[in-house]
């Protein structure tokens, strides 16, 4: 399993209401659209950058 991709699970903890449209688009890109939803994503630099952009709205639940 040398090629097994690492995954990261994120949960939305903040609302997208009254946020900039680019932050809303980032949440949609992370497959999140409601508070309490979780998404399991590949752990790539691109995804990490998206999480950093909306770090006040999401939390990392698990890293595998």
UniProtKB/Swiss-Prot annotation:
Keywords: Ribonucleoprotein, Ribosomal protein
Keyword Ribonucleoprotein: yes
InterPro entries hit by this protein: Ribo_uL30_ferredoxin-like_sf, Ribosomal_uL30_bac-type, Ribosomal_uL30_ferredoxin-like
A cellular-component GO term for this protein: cytosolic large ribosomal subunit
One GO MF term attached to the UniProt entry: structural constituent of ribosome
SUPFAM superfamilies associated with the record: Ribosomal protein L30p/L7e
Pfam family, one: Ribosomal_L30
Gene3D superfamilies: Ribosomal protein L30, ferredoxin-like fold domain
GO terms (BP aspect): translation
CDD domains: Ribosomal_L30 (cd01658)
Family (UniProt): Belongs to the universal ribosomal protein uL30 family.
Quaternary structure (record): Part of the 50S ribosomal subunit.
Protein name (Swiss-Prot/TrEMBL): Large ribosomal subunit protein uL30
Organism: Rhodopseudomonas palustris (strain BisB18)
Gene: rpmD
